[in-house]
Structure formats: structure tokens, C-alpha cells
Amino acid sequence: MFRIGIVGAGAIGKEIARAIDNGTVPAKLEAIYDRDTAEATSFAASLKSKPRVLPLEELVEASNFVVEAAAQSAVREVAIAALSRSRSVMIMSVGALADKELLETIRTMAKEHCCSIYLPSGAIGGLDAVKAASICKIDSVTITTRKPRDGLRGAPFIVRNNIDVDSMDEPTEIFSGPAAVAIKEFPANVNVAASLSLVGIGFERTLVRVVVDPTIKRNIHEISVRGEFGELHTVVENVPARSNPKTSFLAALSAIATLRQVCEPLKIGT
């Protein structure tokens, strides 16, 4: 049985932990780590499995599968700690992998230590189709992210440019550019663009549009892909996570589904 250690006790980390704790994922929740030890301890105590709250190094030693659900800034430390000890790792903060050096480092480590790196689809649909389409030529990939004010409030791009989202009373596009830039400007909002870039045409050629839309209550991701295979258009209207409006509930469900697939012998999907 997999012994899973979760790094990060935020909205997504907690949803994943609950899914393991209630048996949705057939594994053991071994340990939790968060910079806020008090929060992690309180949350762990609320679970029936009573996982231990451990420092990162001890969590990795105690587990045989590690989940990063913290932040882009934590990915390097968590992934290297896990892979160096031959632990497979699932990365939720996929935007960190826009760093080519980091991506190549962890790929090499995974090969050397005979383990795997898992990147869930997140809050978008159609990733399997894009992965299949990438076998031939893809001409263009565009993702348009529409979020209510609270879903984008505080993003570095908004703060640096003094954008007042509260003054917007109609849908307003505030950013259009390559995924490589979008991921840095909106690190808590467009991780889906990173997953899409990795399976498609890369971070520089994937176009990201960000729209503040005060008329909606959901996080909407629209994807358009054109290539030799034909055309793909998907729209997903996501309910925000209960404790973090910047995160979609589907992102947590995607992580849970990935863990279930890791634990099960039957693998479905491209």
C-alpha cells in the first residue's frame, strides 16, 4: 500500500488528505507538513487516521509517495527531497516547471532513481487530447482564464500595475501573453497553463489571456487548439475551492483522481 506524505495544508492539500482519510484513495495518509505547524497539527487531529505532522525530510523518509500541494516556491525543495530518496512525487504547483533547469533536473533524477513525477490535469479538460495531438504538428494553443474579482485579487501583475479589480463592472481582459510570463505574473491562478504548455507547444508559444469578470462566480478556462489533428475547443466552468477562491475545486478532484490511478492496476486515458 502507498504511504502518502502531503506537503501543504492549504485548500488542495486538505482535500487530498480527506480523500485518502475517507478511503476514496486506497492508500495510507502517513504524514503532513506545512510551514504553519499549528494549522497542520489542528487539521491532522481532525482526521480519523491521525497522520503525523513531520518536517519535510522526515515526511519523505516515512512515505513512499510525496504530494506537493504548497506553492511554486516549494517545488524544487520538495521534488528533489522526494526523488533523491526514490520516492515518486505528484506536483500540484506545475507552474514551477516553466523553469527549464528545474524540469530537466527532476526528470534526470526520476530516471536515475527509478521513480515517477505526476502532474494532474488540474482544472481544465482536454489535456489527454492535446497530449495525443502533440504527436503530430500543433499550430496554436490558447487558454483564456476568466475569474471573478476575488479569484485574481493580489496577483503580482495586478499589484505591480495598480489594477483596481473592484472598479471593474464588466468583463475586462487584463493580460495577454505567453504562458512563460503568465505563470510568473499569476502564480496562484494559471497553473493550468503550465500543464497545457508541457503537453503541447511549450511555454513560449502557448498564449494565455486573463479576464477579470465581475459577472461570474466561477473560474472559467477556455482552451482552443489547432493542428494537423483538427481543432479542439473546451470550456470548463469551475466551482472555486471552499477555502480559496483562487483555486478551483476540480483541481483538487484531479489530484485525487490521479492518486487513485496511481494506486489502481487499471490505467484509463492517454
Swiss-Prot record:
InterPro entries: Asp/hSer_DH_NAD-bd, Asp_DH, Asp_DH_arc, Asp_DH_prok, L-Asp_DH, NAD(P)-bd_dom_sf. Specifically catalyzes the NAD or NADP-dependent dehydrogenation of L-aspartate to iminoaspartate. Keywords: NAD, NADP, Oxidoreductase, Pyridine nucleotide biosynthesis. It comes from Methanocella arvoryzae (strain DSM 22066 / NBRC 105507 / MRE50). One of its GO terms (molecular function) is NADP binding. NAD(+) binds at residues 123, 191. Belongs to the L-aspartate dehydrogenase family. It is an enzyme of class 1 (oxidoreductase). SUPFAM superfamilies: Glyceraldehyde-3-phosphate dehydrogenase-like, C-terminal domain, NAD(P)-binding Rossmann-fold domains. It catalyses: L-aspartate + NADP(+) + H2O = oxaloacetate + NH4(+) + NADPH + H(+); L-aspartate + NAD(+) + H2O = oxaloacetate + NH4(+) + NADH + H(+). The iminoaspartate product is unstable in aqueous solution and can decompose to oxaloacetate and ammonia. Pathway: Cofactor biosynthesis; NAD(+) biosynthesis; iminoaspartate from L-aspartate (dehydrogenase route): step 1/1. This is L-aspartate dehydrogenase. GO terms for biological process: NAD biosynthetic process. The keyword DNA-binding does not apply. It comes from the Archaea. The keyword Oxidoreductase applies. The active site is at 221.
